[in-house]
Structure formats: structure tokens, C-alpha cells
């Protein structure tokens, strides 16, 4: 099977399995479809000759493609099983359309269009095949394009390149706090360094991520009948709104870019007695990150003084750290990636990613893990699309990295 056909076939096969993560679940994995996808991948890994294939109770799959260059450093690739829940359908219906410069109708029945004026980046792919969904869901190239790249890579290593041991890991629930990567026993993934394939357009390389934390703030009010509420009722919903008002409206995701940090007040559930607010804290700079956490604490204390008959409790939990510190301690992964892209004639676009990846978790565990492109655009959107030529180039980079690692 030609490389292009295999990549597209694998992507369609993996996309057909509903694996949207569920942030309300405390289970790992948070959805049964992730376990089903993990089982399929484990079977396919065994079929193409991987050794030590293991799938555990949390749907974490690991294995190794043994090398033919014993002196080469062991390297790894990691991808996540889940697709994101942004309120769209969990069922993905991918299709391949040829882009000829006109708006693409991705769902005629629902009259959903991928419009060039709104997504001018598609103009770079004039005359090419584009994988899109049907507009009712995300496409799920984040991260099933990476799974397809890694599985195609593993099946072709012996035929195309000399290589050392190549370890692979597929983990659940990246989209809800990197739960799978955090739970993974890295003794099952004993590589010197690794790669995530979890960013967007052709040439993108991520050497920095946010520092990230989540915060749960609980406001306890005082309930009362409205006919006798004066001087007594403390409305927890209004307490939460008051809390939010203490933060700069411009320090939010929709008002920031580049290296700006932000607060994201994300979920609010309230009744007459209690309101629960979720806030996400993001900053590239460690000092700025800590200042933001201290700001949450300071505002909570102000609220306690303002509402003496109510109460405010909060808990801040670190989610992941900026990957840059770990990458600086061992530069081989980045050097090989840059060399691979240079030899393939792919211009690199180094970005500070306004998000995080499983690689941030692995890096904190001692395995430096930079991130490179799948080739897709518009992650977490119904307008997510994947140009097939960019998809192929992602595989070429992975193959070249394995080859170069064996000759270092």
C-alpha cells in the first residue's frame, strides 16, 4: 500500500472509533471508546512485529520496535487516544475533498461550509486533497493523525531506514489534564528522548508550552426566601460574578496572544446555597505563573471579608510545566528534529505553544519530549482540516528522525 493511502486509511479507521474524553468522569480512561481504540492499536502493534506490547487497565498502550543499529540511542513517540469535547458530536465522519480554491461544503444537509474568507490558510493547499469532518464534530486530527503517523512509521522502519529501538506510547485523556501521561509508568517507555506529534501546520515545532494550573473555587452563600431576604440572603452566584470581576477582562484567552498569559473562567454551576467556579491559569513565565496563583488567593481573601456570613474556598492544582527547561538539559531531541527537517527541505516554525502536551508531562519525568506538526489546522474546531501532503510530511520527519538517531 502506498504511504498516502496507508496514512489516510489508518486515520479513517481510528477516527471511526468514538473516543471523546469526558472531564466529568473520574475514571481513567474517562470514556469506553478510548479503551476500544487502545485494544485495536495493541493488536496492530503485535501484527507489525512490535515487542513487549502492553495495554494496562487504564488503556495505556506501550511497545517497542527493536532496532537494527544496537549503538543507537533509544527514542520514543507518544500520542493521545482521546479527542476533545467542545460540545460537538463525539462521532467523527471524515471525508477527503479536493480544494480548488472555492469554499468547501462539508455538510450539504446542514449547510455547513469551510469558507476561504474565514480560513485563508487553506489557500496554501490549492489543488490538494484535504481531510475534513462533516461539520458536526471536530475532525480529531488532534491526535489521531499522530496515531496514524506513528503506526505507519512502525510498519515501515525495517524496510526504509536503519534505526535503534523505537518505543511507542498511546495514552488516554490528554485533553482533560494529561491524565494518561501522568499515570504512565515510564519504565515501560525507557527511551533517552521522545517526540509528541501534536501541533498544527506543516513545519511547526513546539519547544515551549504554558505553565498550567486549574483552580476550583467554591462560594457558599446564605439562602433565604426572597420575601424576607433583605440583610440575610447571600447569593453565591453573585459572589462568583463578583470574584470574576476582580480580574482584568483583557487577561483572557480571547484577548491575549503570543507569550501573554491569562485566566480562563470556564465553568460555573450554582444553586441557592453554593456556586462552584472553575478557573484555568496559564503563563509561560514561572514568576508570572506564580503571581497569577497568588492573585487567586488574594481575591479569595478579599471575598471572605466582603461576605462575612458566606465563605470562599479554593484549591489550585498544577497541571503541567513549561517543557523548555527539560529540553535545555538534553538538546539531542531538538537537534535531530531540526536536522531532519532541514534535510527534508521543510522550513521550521518554532512556536511557544499556547497549550500543553503529553510531552510536558514526560519531560518533567526526565524524558525530554519536543513536539512537531501533524499538518492539521484549527484543532478543537468543527473547521479542523488536514491537508494530505502535510500529513505525509509529518511521517517523513518521523522516519528521518529515526534514521538520523541511528547515525549519531
Swiss-Prot record:
Enzyme Commission identifier(s): 3.4.11.-
Q: Does the keyword rRNA-binding apply?
A: no
What's the source species for this entry?
Answer: Rhizobium meliloti (strain 1021)
Query: What is annotated as the active site?
Result: 82, 174
Task: Work out whether the entry's keyword set contains Cytoplasm.
Answer: no
Protein residues bound to Zn(2+) 1? 80, 142, 198
Q: Which residues cross the membrane?
A: none
- UniProt name for this protein: Peptidase T-like protein RB0614
Q: What class of enzyme is it?
A: hydrolase
CDD domains, A to Z: M20_peptT
List keywords of the entry alphabetically. Hydrolase, Metal-binding, Metalloprotease, Plasmid, Protease, Zinc
Q: Which cofactor does it need?
A: Zn(2+)
| InterPro entries recorded | ArgE/DapE_CS (IPR001261), Bact_exopeptidase_dim_dom (IPR036264), Peptidase_M20 (IPR002933), Peptidase_M20_dimer (IPR011650), Peptidase_M20B (IPR010161)
Instruction: Name the Gene3D superfamilies for this protein.
Output: 3.30.70.360, Zn peptidases (3.40.630.10)
Pfam families in UniProt:
M20_dimer, Peptidase_M20
Q: Where does Zn(2+) 2 bind?
A: 142, 175, 380
The terms under GO molecular function for this entry are: metallopeptidase activity; tripeptide aminopeptidase activity; zinc ion binding
Cofactor binding notes: Binds 2 Zn(2+) ions per subunit.
Q: Which GO terms describe its biological process?
A: peptide metabolic process; proteolysis
UniProt similarity note? Belongs to the peptidase M20B family.
